[in-house]
Amino acid sequence: MNTRNRVVNSGLGASPASRPTRDPQDPSGRQGELSPVEDQREGLEAAPKGPSRESVVHAGQRRTSAYTLIAPNINRRNEIQRIAEQELANLEKWKEQNRAKPVHLVPRRLGGSQSETEVRQKQQLQLMQSKYKQKLKREESVRIKKEAEEAELQKMKAIQREKSNKLEEKKRLQENLRREAFREHQQYKTAEFLSKLNTESPDRSACQSAVCGPQSSTWKLPILPRDHSWARSWAYRDSLKAEENRKLQKMKDEQHQKSELLELKRQQQEQERAKIHQTEHRRVNNAFLDRLQGKSQPGGLEQSGGCWNMNSGNSWGI
């Protein structure tokens, strides 16, 4: 294999003494210069006379003017060619082994075991039933959608019912706490009033006990004056609470009535839809039976005078 080596410039590597001197009288300036052919001949003649280190290192090289030609390595070239041929042979062998095999199928009759008449009747029956299948499919999807909506509505009702129960429980706890605080406050005020009354009038109480001693052995609390402002405030609070309870009960009743009305309306719609579906189903069945009866009778169409065909077309909604 021929490869190009780096360019060796003979003029740059030569010493100044070895360079040819130019004669000043030579106008062309070519005196002392050799042609490429003469330079090659001199190089070939000088090689056997004085073998240098470069000639020993670059064995098998040949100088051609400013380039050096290297002879190919025969053994390496043969080895590369042998490996390439072996790889090509292996590739062809692999292709031959992995080639797609022919497909052998058992011949059989197309169309199955049914006759053409049976297949056509089956196709006609499927075509006639496809309309009703689509209708049933739509009704089924509507029913599933309504069931999902009803489940969602029941879920929302349960959530609202739970919220109302929690609100009632919270109000009941608040009312119990309020009553407990009021009872404690009342007991505290009563005890304070009694202690103040006992400290301010000990003589009067002793006198009353001495006067009333022989007559009665039990001592009764004096009748306290009623605080009208406190009574009015508590009456106002009780009235507000009663008003709130009445409004809450009214809202519950309205919500219950609305839910009952919605349930009644839904039931009526379901009944109407069932009636319509039943009527349509009966009409279609009658039309289908009429058509079958007309086909079974040999002179059915001629006897009716074409009126049966018109009625059957109207019955099918055409």
Swiss-Prot record:
Tissue specificity statement from the Swiss-Prot or TrEMBL entry: Highly expressed in placenta, small intestine, spleen, kidney, thymus, liver, salivary gland and testes. Weakly expressed in breast, skeletal muscle and colon. Highly expressed in breast cancer upon interaction between tumor cells and stromal cells in vitro. Expressed in blood mononuclear cells from patients with systemic lupus erythematosus (SLE).
Keywords from the UniProt entry: Coiled coil
Region spans: Disordered: 1-60
Coiled coil: 73-188, 240-280
Induction remark: Up-regulated in breast carcinomas.
Source taxon at top rank: Eukaryota
Keyword check for Coiled coil: yes
Purpose: Plays a role in M1 macrophage polarization and is required for the proper regulation of gene expression during M1 versus M2 macrophage differentiation. Might play a role in RELA/p65 and STAT1 phosphorylation and nuclear localization upon activation of macrophages.
Protein name: Epithelial-stromal interaction protein 1
